[in-house]
Amino acid sequence: MRKPDFTALRVQIVGAKGHTGAMLRTVLTAAGVGHVVQIEDSRRALSLLSSEHFDAVFVEETQLDSMNFARSARKRAALRNPLIPIFAVYSGPRRRDVEKARDLGVTNVICRPVSPKTISDKLLAALLKPRPFIAAPDFFGPDRRARARVWRAGDRRKHIPRKSTIVVDS
């Protein structure tokens, strides 16, 4: 199989400082990503996402400030691409970390150490086969269900949920 061509991609790294940021930038470059912008401040990163086109965002999830980056990005009306893939990069995430990232609108969680192949595979999946986006009163982001499951039991909900919309990028 041919190596994917990511030379035209513009990717943003948010919140990664020093050695961590340099390593992530190196791995993205080794995966073939053509243009990588590294920003430490999440407010500045959101501003840049509103004014420039980016194909994906990698968020270092070690800072409290960057923990809510995905939520802010998904809620921001001025964002040029509200369906942009957002990847959270963790070193040893726990289940609750993954669930929180998912609930904040993160597309996928990546564990460090990360390889160019992992980055390439995750980018390909997010760009070529994106999950549908859900627009609900309390959530906007990729469908949180990793895979579709057939439910054969009865409805156990105690309350009828408020109306949600599935957004499909065409």
Question: Can you describe what each PLM-predicted range is?
Answer:
Residues T7-H19, L24-L28, Q38, V57-F58:
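Conserved acidic segment of CheY-like receiver
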Residues Q12, V57, T62, R80-R95:
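A short, hydrophobic beta-strand element within the central beta-sheet of small alpha/beta folds
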Residues V33-D41, L48:
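Short hydrophobic/Thr-rich beta-strand motif most characteristic of the beta2 strand and flanking loop
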Residues S51, D55-P82:
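Conserved phosphotransfer microenvironments
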Residues N68, G92-N108:
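Alpha4 helix (beta4-alpha4-beta5 surface) of REC/receiver domains from two-component response regulators
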Residues V114-L127, A135:
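C-terminal output helix
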Residues L128-S170:
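CheY-like receiver
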